[in-house]
Curated annotation (Swiss-Prot):
Domain of life: Eukaryota
UniProt protein name: Prestalk D11 protein
GO cellular component, one term: vesicle
Highest classification ranks of the organism: Eukaryota, Amoebozoa, Evosea, Eumycetozoa, Dictyostelia
Signal peptide residue numbers: 1-25
């Protein structure tokens, strides 16, 4: 029994000595290379002479990008960011692209550059015409100068009146006609009922406008026309191979007209129209 007690005392003393030897390690006699921890890991030197990497916990890093300075390595709990590598453009030969309007040239990570849309750029609304040799490129491009007037000596223009549409300017060899600013009061203006074609240079404007000349006579060699009188419809012109007959007068309102039963012969120049028409004198 005594021998067993002595053996237990010896074993307990050995354990105490071994624990003390592990806690109090003499690192002066230890040679090792400290490990390089990857980003978001840190070196722990608490219970090791050479240290070991462990994850960073309870560490707050800013969201702002911090680029590494000269010689700095992206390690630690809040590592820096390596700056973008610039290519060696000394041995590169290329033609820089010409960017279209509202695009700009970016030379950040390319030797020849690339075009990218302009963002965050404010341009004035005032028109800036391009100078001699200037090209309309860049974020706020210039406006090309209007071209010279063309040679209109050999350009045939139609004689039909063409009014300018919205936004159209009376320019070019065959310019449009500006819209009349104000229509005249034609309620008391009597107009002749005879068809009047426009003369050269005359425009069908005013209270009694002329009728534009037909642009081209049609080929009526194979057209058969009847002998029946066909009056022109509303807006129809007496043109074409089988022209209509112009309406002499509008149909009057004869609901209140009082006509006699006596025969009334037409006077010279009078035609049998109206509510009480005359009768043509066939004996003359």
């Amino acid at each position: 029994m005594l021998n067993k007690l002595i053996l237990l005392l010896i074993l307990s003393s050995c354990l105490v000595l071994s624990v003390k030897s592990e806690v109090n390690v003499d690192c002066s006699l230890v040679r090792c290379a400290q490990p390089i921890c990857k980003p978001h890991y840190r070196l722990n030197m608490t219970d090791s002479c050479c240290g070991r990497c462990e994850p960073c916990t309870d560490v707050a890093c800013t969201l702002q990008v911090k680029y590494c300075q000269d010689g700095e390595v992206p390690t630690g709990c809040c590592p820096c960011t390596l700056p973008p590598t610039k290519p060696d453009c000394s041995l590169v030969k290329c033609a820089r692209p010409v960017c279209k309007p509202y695009y700009r040239l970016n030379m950040t990570d390319s030797c020849c550059g690339r075009c990218e849309p302009c963002t965050g750029v404010a341009c004035t609304l005032q028109i800036k015409y391009c100078k001699d040799g200037e090209v309309p490129t860049g974020c706020c491009p210039c406006t090309p100068q209007p071209t010279k007037k063309p040679d209109c000596s050999k350009v045939p223009c139609p004689k039909i009146l063409k009014y300018c549409q919205e936004g159209e300017l009376p320019t070019g060899c065959c310019p449009c006609t500006p819209q009349p600013t104000k229509k005249p009061d034609c309620s008391r203006v009597p107009c002749p009922k005879i068809l009047k074609y426009c003369k050269e240079g005359e425009l069908p404007t005013g209270c009694c406008p002329c009728t534009p000349q037909p642009t081209k006579k049609p080929d009526c060699s194979d057209v058969m026309c009847t002998m029946d009188i066909r009056y022109c419809k509303n807006g129809e012109l007496p043109t074409g191979c089988c022209p209509c007959t112009p309406q002499e007068t509008k149909v009057p309102d004869c609901s209140k007209a009082m006509c006699t039963m006596d025969i009334k012969y037409c006077k010279p120049g009078e035609k049998p129209f109206g509510c009480c028409p005359c009768r043509e004198n066939l004996t003359q």
